[in-house]
Structures are given as structure tokens and as C-alpha cells.
Regions:
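A conserved FAD-binding loop/helix module that cradles the flavin
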Residues: 209, 213-216, 301-357, 436-459, ...
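Flexible, glycine-rich terminal cap/loop adjacent to redox cofactors
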Residues: 2, 7-35, 40, 47, ...
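Glycine-rich flavin
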Residues: 2-4, 11, 20-27, 32-169, ...
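Rossmann-like NAD(P)H-binding beta-loop-alpha module
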Residues: 167-209, 310
């Protein structure tokens, strides 16, 4: 039986991060990958979706040309085939780039293509071969959730795994599940001329928790395509397409885009052989600060553990896992990053830090700043719609979280997340310089509202003096 120091299961973001670190120390490893290469982000997630969104944004802009004195927009048309070809070209560029610097450089003794299964806590079997590893990192990723009853729809059922392969877009599509992926794809398809209807089981979009931000998101996004919230949808194939039924009525579409979340790729890898208790979803016990499974020399990182299934977290978990795998049995508990999420819709949606539903409202200041008619730059852009919801701890006076729906929220969400990560007080944020006229002034106004609730007028007015010191 072959023996190696490290076994990495999965060649996604976490697995490749671990691979890079291990290769700097030793060649005594094997990477085993049973699915497609190139990472979820590059192949079916972040990157191709942004390519699609940018095409949609450019075409949608024609609707506002007249307001800016530009005539002739009515004559513009969209070539769906060319759009999807462009999306795939970028997708292929990114996936090729990922592989060129990682798996393409591995020899056949270091990279095995196949699905591995644990047969003992330190042994996996792949393609009929058993391999023993001193330390094992599980990074097998995730896949779209598809209800069994829907699978009979065949090619009328589309997930993020298939949408970017479409040569032509359907005329009518139901987007079921309006989290980040569903909302991004739904709005993009709508702007490209597809008739879109959105359905979501919860009463919010993108998992927003702030009541004000949630209402604003629903109001603004539903102007582009109809949205039905708080309703379970049933699907039924018809001769012409698919029938969608909710309590509000029945709708006929040509296809369904299922965006019901992602399921960790745990099944089939033999985790029961680890000798630890698995939960009702088949997940082994693991520490989010070490990525260690129980007390074993086994680590689980990235989408497969279901903790924070997003690229930057997968990379971070890959680093934690490999550092502790290399140091085993001496474990280091790493501080996790401040939660951060962004939806690339229009207006963009961002959320960070502590969620509204987790707040102790008696110990927290909550403010809501409406962008409408309150920011000069947004007004001249014709985009003064949105809200900034921020939360600050009364005792420490630190910013602890928030949600935004506004133009270019991706940038301001980062800015505010960094402030939470640095444990900055609200007054320190208000002391920062703000140029004019910029959208950042909206953030300044929102922070100012927090300051008014946390500090005396004298403390706020003393800012200039404090800055000079």
C-alpha cells in the first residue's frame, strides 16, 4: 500500500490553497479530485456570473440614455448567442489560469483523477488503490441543491452548473430561490430580455435581516421582474414547458433556474470510517478555528463543511487546515474573519459583521440612512435609491455590523467590514476624511447617525481638535 505524508481530497479553492503550502515543504503528497477542475468560483460561480452580469448591465443602461441626452437607444438589440460565448470565453480563461498554476504542474503520482473514499481514519481508496496518509485534508466542495422530484424536468431544469453552458436563453424562466445566486442570475437574465419570475420561500431577498434594508431590496428589485415571497413553489413538467404553482397562482415558463443553496459533497466519501459521530447531515464534528475533525489528523475546509461557503473563506480555511495539518498534533486556533457578503445586483447589496437577527437590541444602536435625495453624487448619477443599516455596540461604541443596498455597495461593504475587523469606534470612523461629492458621504452620514446616538454633542464637535492632536 502506498504511503504519503499528506492527502488532499479536492482541487478547489481550499484544496489548492493547501497544495501551494505543502509543495513548499515536500513532494510527499497526493491530491485526489473526482470532479471538474478549475474551482467552483472560476468555473460555475463568481467569475462567469460577473461576465454575464456585466453584459446585462451594459444592455440595461440603454433604458436611461434618454435621461442623459443620448438618443437612439430604441434601436439597440441583444445577441444572446454572442453574450453566452463571451461568458464562456472568460470562464475558460479563468479556469485555465487556475489549473496552469496548480494541478497542470503535478505529475501522475501526485494527482489522481477519481473519487476517493475513506476505508479507515488514515486510509482512502481511489480507483481500486488504497493510500495511507499521515494527515488528510477534506476539501471536496459542494454542489447545487436539486430536489429529487425536480430531476424529471431534464434540460428544462437549470442550475449554476448548467446556466453558463446555454447556447441560447429561454424566453421565460422561473428563478426559484432568491439568495445571492438566484437574484444575480435572475436580474441579469431579465435585463437580457428573458421574462423572469422569482420565487422565494422566505420573506426577504439574499438573506437580508435588517427590516429596512430588506424592504428596500424588495421594492427596488421587484421593479424589474415579479417576485413572490414566503411561498413554496411546486413544479410540474408540461408539453410546452414547466408549470409553477404557488398560493398566488399558476405560471407557465420554459425552464426553471433552481437556486436553493449548495450541498456539501460529503456523501460517498466514507466519513463513517473516521470513527466519529456524524450529524443528521453526515457532517463530522470539526473546530472552525482549527478545521480539525475531532482529534484526528484529518481536517475539513471550504464549502464541504458548510460553514461559510464563499471563496475568500474557503481560501482562509485552506490555510488554517494546512497549517494545522503540518503542525499536528500541535493545533493553533485561528481567529476567523469578519463575515462579509455581497450580491452583484443593481443596486448592489452588501452585509457584514453581526446580523440583525443576532443583535441584542437593548445593547445595540441601530440606524437606517436613506439614500434618496440625501447624497449629491447619487442624485446626479440617477441612482439615489437605497438604504444603509448600521449597528453599533452601546458599551464599546464599536461598529459591529450592517447591511447596505446602494450603488457600488461592494466597496463600502469592504470598507465597513475592515472597520469591524479593526474594532474601530464610531467616532474614529467619523474622524476620517471624506471627499465631495462622493458616495462615501452617504457612509459618513450613516456613521454620523450612529455617533449622535452614542456620543454627546460636545464629543462629536471636538473631532477637529482631536484630529489635530
Amino acid at each position: 500500500m502506498r504511503r504519503v505524508k499528506y492527502i488532499i481530497l479536492g482541487a478547489g479553492s481550499s484544496g489548492l490553497t493547501a497544495l501551494g503550502r505543502i509543495r513548499r515543504e515536500t513532494d510527499d503528497f497526493v491530491m485526489i479530485n473526482g470532479g471538474a477542475f478549475g474551482t467552483t468560483c472560476a468555473r460555475v460561480g463568481c467569475m462567469p456570473s460577473k461576465a454575464l452580469i456585466h453584459c446585462a448591465e451594459h444592455f440595461h443602461a440603454r433604458k436611461h440614455f434618454y435621461d442623459f441626452g443620448i438618443d437612439g437607444a430604441d434601436g439597440l438589440t441583444i445577441n444572446h448567442t454572442a453574450v453566452m460565448k463571451r461568458v464562456r470565453a472568460f470562464r475558460d480563461r479563468f479556469t485555465s489560469g487556475v489549473q496552469a498554476g496548480s494541478t497542470d504542474t503535478l505529475g501522475p503520482d501526485q494527482l489522481i483523477k477519481g473519487f476517493a473514499k475513506f476505508v479507515a481514519p488514515d486510509i482512502v481508496e481511489v480507483n481500486g488503490e488504497k493510500i495511507q496518509g499521515e494527515r488528510i485534508i477534506i476539501a471536496t466542495g459542494s454542489r447545487p441543491v436539486v430536489p429529487d422530484a425536480w430531476k424529471s424536468l431534464g434540460d428544462k431544469l437549470i442550475t449554476s452548473d448548467e446556466v453558463f453552458e446555454l447556447e441560447a436563453l429561454p424566453k421565460r424562466i422561473a428563478v426559484i430561490g432568491l439568495g445571492i445566486i438566484g437574484l444575480e442570475i435572475g436580474q441579469a437574465l431579465s435585463r437580457l430580455g428573458v421574462e423572469v419570475i422569482g420565487f422565494e420561500m422566505s420573506n426577504t431577498l439574499c438573506g437580508l435581516q435588517s427590516p429596512k434594508a430588506s424592504r428596500q431590496a424588495i421594492k427596488l428589485i421587484s421593479r424589474e421582474f415579479p417576485i413572490y415571497l414566503g411561498e413554496a413553489a411546486t413544479v410540474e413538467e408540461t408539453r410546452e414547458g414547466v408549470k409553477i404553482t404557488v398560493s398566488s397562482g399558476t405560471f407557465e415558463v420554459d425552464a426553471v433556474f433552481a437556486s436553493l443553496g449548495r450541498r456539501p459533497n460529503l456523501d460517498g466519501i466514507g466519513l463513517e470510517a473516521l470513527g466519529v459521530d456524524l450529524d443528521n447531515k453526515g457532517m463530522p464534528p470539526f473546530n472552525i478555528h482549527t478545521m480539525q475533525v475531532s482529534d484526528l489528523p484529518v481536517f475539513i475546509a471550504g464549502d464541504v463543511n458548510g460553514f461559510r461557503p464563499i471563496l475568500h473563506e474557503a481560501g482562509h480555511e485552506g490555510k488554517i487546515a494546512v497549517n494545522n495539518a503540518m503542525a499536528y498534533p500541535n493545533m493553533t486556533a485561528y481567529k476567523r474573519k469578519t463575515p462579509l457578503g455581497i450580491a452583484f445586483v443593481d443596486p448592489q447589496i452588501g452585509f457584514f459583521g453581526v446580523g440583525y437577527e443576532s443583535l441584542d437590541l437593548d445593547q445595540t444602536v441601530v440606524i437606517n440612512f436613506k439614500l434618496e435625495r440625501n447624497n449629491g453624487r447619487a442624485i446626479v448619477m440617477g441612482e439615489d435609491k437605497g438604504v444603509i443599516s448600521l449597528y453599533a455596540d452601546k458599551a464599546s461604541k464599536q461598529l459591529i455590523g450592517g447591511e447596505l443596498i446602494m450603488p457600488h455597495a461592494e466597496h463600502f461593504t469592504h470598507l465597513l467590514t475592515w472597520a469591524v475587523e479593526q474594532q474601530l469606534e464610531v467616532l474614529e470612523l467619523l474622524r476620517m476624511p471624506y471627499y465631495h461629492p462622493v458616495l462615501e458621504e452617504a457612509v459618513e452620514s450613516a456613521i454620523g447617525l450612529l455617533a449622535e446616538a452614542l456620543y454627546t454633542r460636545d464629543e462629536i464637535e471636538a473631532l477637529e481638535t482631536l484630529s489635530q492632536n
